[in-house]
Amino acid sequence: MIDKSPVLLTTERLHLMLLPPDAAERVLAYHVANKDHLGPVSPARPATFFSPAYWRTRLAQDREDFRYDVSLRVFLLPKGQPLALAPIIGNATLAHIRRGPLQAADLGYGLDHRHEGKGLMTEALRAFCDFAFSAMGLHRLQANHLPENLRSAAVLRRLGFIPEGYARDFLLINGKWRDHVLNSLVAPAEPGLRGGP
C-alpha cells in the first residue's frame, strides 16, 4: 500500500499535513533551526531527537497514533511550493486524545522563529481546532503555557481559549519543574463559528 500523506487541512497561506517518514530531513531541519527558540519551552528531548533516524521512526509512529486515535501531529508548510519540497515552518499536535464521556485532547504547537508575528499560528490553529471539533468529534481542547510566554497566551486568546487556572510545578522543562497557565476551548454549538481574526 502506498502512503501518500494527503493534506489534512488547507488555510489561506498554509497546508497542515501529517507527514510520511521520508520527510524526516525537513522535520529535522525545522527543529535544528529552532533549537534555541523552542528548546526553552519544551520538555526534555531524547538524545537522538536531532537525528534523521529519530524523525523517520517518529513520523511512522505519528501515522499509527492517528490511525488508532491516540494523537495527531501535523506540520505547517507554506502554500505556493510543491508539498514534497516545501519547508516546515511549524507544527501542531493533539495529544492524549481521550474518548468516552470526556472527548478531549491536549493541544501543543510551535512555530519557526523566522515566521512569528505574521498571524500564521493563529491561522493554522483555528483550522486545526475546527478539524478537532468537527471531523474528529472532540468536545474540549486543553492548552497550557508558561506564564511568561505572552505570545502563546495571545494566540490562545485570539482562538477563544479561556484561562482556567494556574498549575504549580506542572511540567519538567530544562531540568526544572515549571508552572503553567491552564486554558481550554470547548466545541462551539456549530463548528466554524468561533472567535474573530
Identify what each model region corresponds to.
Residues 1-26, 30-40, 75-197:
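Acyl-donor (CoA/ACP) binding surface of acyl/acetyltransferases
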Residues 37-61:
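Conserved GNAT-fold acetyl-CoA-binding loop/helix
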Residues 60-64, 130:
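Surface-exposed alpha-helical segments enriched in charged/polar residues
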Residues 65-69:
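Soluble sensory domains of the PAS superfamily and closely related sensory modules
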